[in-house]
């Protein structure tokens, strides 16, 4: 089954690796420069929250020492425990933890705002970028690949950025702060606790090294699975019509098996990390407890210090694990950022030109002057194409499939630029116009109609957004669609669904004609009336098109030659070249390629009727 793209191609899963990790993060931090003050506040509150949290175990240790000394005193016949002192210590600890929680809440609130504003800005810039991209970019990239950058990659960036930034600050602060507190209790116990670090680092490196390739595989196959699901859904009618269900299921299962294999291995290695780290941490607790007991007997430390130290050891190993997780999240952040910035850095169309030609007052004369073009420079498909079209003329472009008919239209609207030669409107090269102003001169109505989810009124008004309701209705009347709209529930306020399947194919084409009439363009690009409608609707479409073409230069891409007999000029294309041009009668009289095409269509019709 041909690849048609998928929504999930490279969605930025944890562990996906960027090609240029440092460069991408540097670019991301530069991009977030507008939030520099916010990030400073995030860092300050994160550090404060962590410091207050770190002080807690040391103070709790004093409470433990007070309780221990009180018990010993009571056994020895003394005054026993000082509950007032113990209460003061516990209240102080509670206050510290409350302040710590408040600081963490504030930094989390600020960081969430920063990450959401960053993703909002990225989505906005990507959306604007899409409108400035050349058509050949979309012709060479799967739809899902582009959509993934707007959805999956930006979401991944926002989520991982929100988590990794604060996690990194708090983890590093915790490691430094806990190390200082441990040293203040006992340098010897600190040395024993730190000995577990090299083992942890080695194991983490081993796990991360072996999991990376499986994460990349998981990401690749996830994109393939999403792409297959998208094309199966969009083409399910064709699949059923050709009885290809088993082939589709077999292909999907093969890709799904690969995804399962790589996902299982990546998650297995990722899942190994926590149990291994916990085992090493427990070994550290045992060593610290034994050494702490010995030092207490020697009166080198207090009993409460053992309890404080064990808490610090736990707090020391936990941020190390978090740093490892942050490393994974940063990889994910960098990978998603890289893909987003790659798209934002893509070459754009030049939207404006110095001293542009104004479209005001232009009549619609068009000239193709020795045009050469190929989608690939090594394969030219339009060779030395020349033609002159006068304003108001109806020009039919005919030829077999692949002759270059649609390509000529794309060049005329400057979706692509010619390799050599020139296309001129009223003597001005199309390259001398701003693209947006140039395209304002054109209206397009093709057999493949495009209507969006919204009301019928909104769909017609898309031709000119500042049009009044009355102007929209007048355009609909000119397109012979007004009466049909009035029969619908809600009339012009009826909502079309996402595929506009709640109106017929012919009605769709009438609506797009109404849209073009409202736009009032100088030059029209038309497909012939769709052949998949009843005779009455086809007559209405033809009348609407006649109203639309009146007084306008019109290019009609024709397949049924019987529909363009009244054209002022017929351009006959073959393998990218104009091989004949003239009126219908002139071309038939020549008995050339056009006559062969015309006669073959009527021979096919006669055979079908017979």
Annotated model-derived regions:
Residues 34, 38-51, 62, 163-217, ...:
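Transmembrane helices of ABC transporter permease
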Residues 181-195, 265, 269-338, 343-344:
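Helix-loop-helix
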Residues 39-103, 184-188, 299-303:
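Transmembrane helix-loop-helix hairpins at lipid-water interfaces of multipass membrane proteins
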Residues 11-16, 116, 124-148, 152-154, ...:
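Short intracellular "coupling" helices and adjacent cytoplasmic loop segments at the cytosolic face
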Residues 33-37, 135-136, 154-161, 165, ...:
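An intracellular "coupling" helix at the cytosolic face of ABC transporter transmembrane type-1 domains
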Residues 352-353, 359-610:
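ABC-type nucleotide-binding domain
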Residues 37-62, 93, 108-112, 158-173, ...:
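Alpha-helical segments in transporter systems
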Residues 24, 32, 111, 131-176, ...:
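Juxtamembrane loop-to-helix connectors within ABC transporter transmembrane domains
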């Amino acid at each position: 089954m041909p690849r048609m793209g998928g929504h999930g191609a490279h969605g930025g899963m944890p562990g996906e690796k960027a090609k240029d990790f440092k460069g991408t993060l540097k670019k991301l931090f530069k991009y977030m420069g507008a939030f520099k003050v916010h990030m400073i506040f995030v860092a300050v509150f994160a550090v404060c929250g962590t410091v207050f949290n770190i002080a807690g175990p040391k103070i709790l240790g004093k409470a433990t020492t007070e309780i221990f000394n009180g018990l010993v005193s009571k056994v020895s016949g003394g005054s026993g425990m000082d509950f007032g002192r113990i209460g003061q210590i516990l209240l102080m600890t509670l206050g510290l933890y409350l302040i710590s929680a408040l600081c963490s809440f504030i930094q989390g609130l600020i960081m969430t705002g920063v990450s959401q504003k960053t993703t909002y800005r990225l989505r906005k810039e990507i959306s604007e970028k899409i409108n400035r991209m050349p058509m050949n970019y979309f012709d060479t990239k799967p739809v899902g690949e582009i959509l993934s950058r707007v959805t999956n990659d930006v979401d991944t960036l926002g989520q991982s950025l929100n988590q990794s930034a604060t996690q990194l600050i708090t983890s590093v602060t915790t490691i430094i702060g806990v190390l200082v507190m441990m040293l203040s209790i006992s340098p010897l116990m600190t040395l024993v606790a730190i000995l577990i670090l090299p083992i942890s680092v080695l194991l983490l490196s081993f796990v991360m090294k072996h999991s990376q390739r499986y994460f990349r595989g998981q990401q690749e196959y996830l994109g393939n699975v999403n792409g297959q699901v998208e094309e199966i859904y969009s083409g399910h009618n064709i699949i059923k019509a050709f009885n290809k269900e088993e082939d589709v299921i077999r292909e999907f299962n093969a890709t799904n098996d690969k995804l399962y294999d790589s996902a299982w291995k990546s998650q297995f290695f990722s899942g190994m990390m926590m149990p291994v780290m916990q085992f090493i941490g427990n070994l550290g607790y045992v060593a610290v407890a034994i050494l702490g007991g010995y030092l207490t007997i020697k009166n080198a430390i207090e009993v409460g210090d053992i309890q404080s130290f064990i808490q610090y050891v736990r707090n020391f190993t936990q941020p190390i694990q978090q740093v490892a997780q942050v490393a994974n999240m940063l990889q994910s952040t960098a990978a998603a950022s890289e893909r987003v910035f790659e798209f934002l850095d893509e070459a754009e169309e030049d939207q404006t030109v110095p001293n542009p030609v104004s479209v005001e007052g232009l009549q619609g004369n068009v000239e193709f002057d020795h045009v050469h073009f190929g989608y690939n420079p090594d394969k030219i498909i339009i060779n030395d194409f020349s033609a002159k079209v006068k304003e108001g003329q109806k020009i039919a472009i005919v030829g077999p499939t692949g002759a270059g008919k649609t390509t000529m239209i794309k060049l005329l609207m400057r979706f692509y630029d010619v390799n050599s030669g020139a296309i001129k409107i009223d003597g001005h090269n199309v390259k001398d116009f701003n693209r947006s102003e140039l395209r304002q001169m054109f209206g397009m109505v093709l057999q493949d109609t495009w209507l969006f989810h919204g009301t019928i009124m909104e769909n017609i008004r898309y031709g000119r957004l500042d049009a009044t309701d009355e102007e929209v209705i007048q355009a609909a009347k000119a397109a012979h669609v007004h009466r049909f709209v009035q029969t619908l529930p809600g009339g012009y306020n009826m909502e079309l669904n996402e595929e506009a399947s709640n109106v017929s194919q012919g009605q769709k084409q009438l609506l797009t004609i109404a849209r073009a009439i409202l736009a009032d363009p100088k030059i029209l690009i038309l497909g012939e009336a769709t052949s998949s409608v009843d005779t009455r609707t086809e007559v209405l479409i033809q009348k609407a098109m006649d109203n639309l073409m009146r007084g306008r230069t019109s290019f009609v891409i024709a397949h049924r030659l019987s529909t363009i007999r009244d054209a002022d000029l017929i351009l006959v294309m073959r393998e990218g070249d104009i091989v004949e041009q003239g009126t219908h009668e002139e071309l038939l009289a020549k008995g050339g390629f056009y006559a062969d095409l015309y006669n073959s269509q009527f021979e096919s019709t006669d055979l079908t009727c017979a």
